[in-house]
Amino acid sequence: MEISAERLYGNKSNNMKKYKPTSPGRRQMSVSDLSGLTKGNPPRGLRKRLKSHAGRNSQGRITVRHQGGGKKRLFRVIDFKQNKLNIPGRIESVEYDPYRTAFIALVLYKDGERRYILAPEELKAGAEILTSEDAPFEIGMRTPLRRIPVGSFVYNIEMFPGRGGSIARSAGNFAQVLANEKNHTHLKMPSGEVRKVFSE
């Protein structure tokens, strides 16, 4: 017996499908909504095959049990630094990444280079992005923390300038800007901790 999608899914919000409680196993169940994503192979140079170690160490002995098998996956190379300053880019597609919980976006920059970035929630194909000191305060733009208004939510934050984003990178995670000092910004982490990071 087939169950229609309308009966199965209660609602779709925030890229999540919530199932109706048709059985005890379905109650509170939700999965990522992949209907709005682009399918296809990643461009050459932005993908590579990672070797599966199947729970073995360098001596070949099993150190983690029950690992191995599964579907083969291609690793997408993500640009966490986004250091193409003052070069506008256009979002070509928003895609699923099997190695992370967040969706990723393929960006075509004006100089012809393509890169993957982490996709914020409302970023769509065709949107324009920019990394700049003077970037407008819009979704997908990247600018120093000192220019972001207090109370705003940010993601993919650098701990040290130039090292690439390392804070709030997984799906649904964000930090909140609490205060800006001379060279530092106070951020409220996803854990609730308040941390001081460089504002450049």
Named regions from a protein language model:
Residues 108-115, 133-139:
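Short, structured beta-strand/loop micro-motifs enriched in basic residues and often containing a Trp
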Residues 112-124:
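Beta-strand/loop nucleic-acid-binding surfaces
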